[in-house]
Amino acid sequence: MSLFDKKQLVSQADALPGRNTPMPVATLHAVNNHSMTNVPDGMEIALFAMGCFWGVERLFWQLPGVYSTAAGYTGGYTPNPTYREVCSGETGHAEAVRIVYDPSVTRYEQLLQVFWENHDPAQGMQQGNDHGTQYRSAIYPLTPEQDAAARASLARFQDAMQAAGDHRTVTTEIANATPFYYAEDDHQQYLHKNPYGYCGIGGIGICLPPQLA
């Protein structure tokens, strides 16, 4: 596919077929030695896409209350895709991070603040120099409460951009969560394993206004 095509979302009919076998995933998180797959009682899951997942995952594993993070693919059609397939633009997936967190320590609203303030949500099918549908900005809520919070936060951030003189339209996709497929082990906790590796994300200098009571 050409670069132009890679910035157009593929249709389900044209998406790659994928495979039935899930990607092997390490048992333990390379940073904190917590389970990569289990969700302890009382914890919740959040899914965000905001560009290259290497830097995004590091942002979230550093937060208090975050039990584990994982790099992966979601929002598309191809089951159990490879990194190469996702980069082709023919799966429909975004590079995303799965966050398991303790809501008694860090609220979903705080995760949303990290999301909005650490990337450019008005770039469409790219993030910085990374071009393609896999780099789109997206929030994939898993509950009605997450969906409502995500949509309210988008409206507040859009207003904050306008107030700051940035009149672009936020292009962040908010859609119900679809299956999350773990990325290859090389991509998990990449910037822990490769401290000088590429990050590629950065905010636009605008803060998410607090939620009104």
Curated annotation (Swiss-Prot):
SUPFAM superfamilies: Peptide methionine sulfoxide reductase. The active site is at C52. Keywords: Oxidoreductase. InterPro entries: Met_Sox_Rdtase_MsrA_dom (IPR002569), Met_Sox_Rdtase_MsrA_sf (IPR036509), MsrA_MetSO_reductase (IPR050162). One of its GO terms (molecular function) is L-methionine-(S)-S-oxide reductase activity. Its EC number is 1.8.4.11. It holds the Pfam family PMSR. Belongs to the MsrA Met sulfoxide reductase family. This is Peptide methionine sulfoxide reductase MsrA. It comes from Enterobacter sp. (strain 638).
